[in-house]
């Protein structure tokens, strides 16, 4: 699994770097891929951690690629969006990702109301929001960011 921490300015201000540092300390063996992204576009829910599965797989609720779930830059399915995470949550976030069992972080998942509200939006200027590592120019160029 892959954990992607939203480290736009609001995510950083809300403590995303502290949470990521705590997870990385637990992840000394590299069992979980850890990354960052810029703005995810939901400031009021920060810090946010997106949990992705392996590329080419689908969440249990999807029968096919036509299921319409959000995917990461490499085609990974978004399995969970954890919101308002805190440093005290780092151990269970890490354990959930390392084991592949997300039941221990269900209380951190985005609410059905917030999810429904956000799914109605069509992002145009922010269409790659939450998918680009702000420290990797190649990630930006891969989505025609410099075109």
State where each predicted segment sits:
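Feature of Fe-S/electron-transfer and energy-metabolism proteins
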Residues: 1-147
